Amino acid sequence: MPISLRLAWIPPLLTLAACATASPPPTATSTAETNSVPASIAGQSAYGLFLAGQSAINTGEGAAAAGYFTRAAGAADGADAPFVETHAFTAALLAGDIKGAAAIAPVSDDDVVLQRLAFLTVAVDDLASGKAAKAHTLLGQVGAPYNAAGSLLTPFAAAKAGDGEAAISMPVIANDPVASYFASLDQGILFEHLRRYDEAETAFRALIVHGDPGALASLNLGAFLERRGRWADAVATYDQALSRAPGDPTLLAAKARAASRHDAPAMESLDASAAEALTALSSTLVVRKQSEAALAYLRLALRLDPERDAAWLLVGDILTDIGDKDAARVAYLAPKPGQPDYVAARDKLAWSLQADDRKDDALELARTAVTAEPASREAATNLADLLRADERYSESAAILDKLIADEGDTPDWRLLYMRAVDNQLSDHWPEAENDLNLALKERPDEPELLNFLGYSWIDRGEKLHEALAMVQKAVDADPKSGAMTDSLGWGYYRLGDYQTAVEKLELAVSLEAGDPDINNHLGDAYWRVGRRIEARFQWSRVLTLEPDAKLRAEVEAKLRNGLGPISGS
């Protein structure tokens, strides 16, 4: 659903945004035109421009919609004007035109919630434009539901306005642990900006003692120590964080930099640090399924720091989820080679193209990322994943061969797992089995490995009792997995315990109702216990679940002829 039509988080816009089409201005007659007028032929009247904006929204063109609504707002008068201006403001905000949104923000609106969003938008634009004192005043008028954002931005506005004491005054944020964490983190950042170094270090260390989620406090403290020339202390800080998050690439890179004793990272600007806080808030909103609010905060963050790649990735993810693929791809193009998020962004962009069946373009993009970042395992494994999706298994395995060889005697079990998939799908089972056994030596309790090898043995009719024990262990570790429960049920089926198989496979279908293989297995089990009508129902259902050609042919044969007599397990 297009972004500007799902603004239920802004109460004044509920009547405009609660469904897949918004209403025309109050004085206009609602007709089918509101859903079908092409933007290219819309008139220049306020109503014509409004309809053009509606059309752009309905086709997922958020930026174009914002332009039309803004022009409509300029042309509207009388009773229609507030309605159109509200559309123009929210469309511009969500499309990322913060300057445009600030220029038409309804700061005098009668609805206090919409007015507070307007204050927040104008304040961010003022802060980014160097009008810190004005921004600080406006942020004092931002309340619920935007109070966390306003509270986090206020100290940065105070610091930019030259009020150091106000800048280090800890904001009071209730019932929002993420915002409270960033308020404390930002206090350390602001102490450093104010050259109160002892207090900055104390603030960072206090956060680390209390858990340091994401190692953000450790990274900030380490960078702070590097800037002070305290290289050994910085390395120790990163080591401590790595003990909690072994292999974290950001921490490893920071440690290597500190160990080299040069190129200490520059202190981020106040605007960039404020943008980081807004980006963190948006992440929590995404988890809460409040995508539009998250997108608004991300757009505001990018007004403060246009090069905040983490924000661009989240923008791309949200736009992908709501169907604005072109805008999402623009967001994924923002991170540049050499930046930490470049490979992740290219991976997402490649899979976006893959989803549109642009397979060659996706592979070209993935190969470009490998060329740009030859040391990146993530770039290489993404290329392997795309090749596997295209059923080019030997090429995928060849990439993994090199990665596994580079890791020496103890390669990452995940690489072995992926190569096993390639080998199994290309009918090289002995090689796949060997990789799975090697991976299990490294991770003997990993449910995915136990299920893969166990199910493969079951399906091949090999080592059935050992295999059943393996998949039972996998199910015990992940009882909500429909795939693993299916493996268990299929194991009982192959052992001839059809009644237990039915029980397990019914549970598997309840956990993953849309899987054609699980439904097929349940149909077979029903048949073996004499429940023929239910068996045919399950097989018929398989045909509605997009089975591959091989499974479709198998099921169609069973619907015609049923299952033959048991020839052994």
Residue ranges and their predicted role:
Residues 12-13:
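Residue-level signal for mature regions of secreted extracellular proteins and peptides
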Residues 20-22:
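Bacterial signal peptide processing site
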Residues 26-28:
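N-terminal secretory targeting signals
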Residues 1-9:
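Bacterial N-terminal signal peptides that target proteins for export
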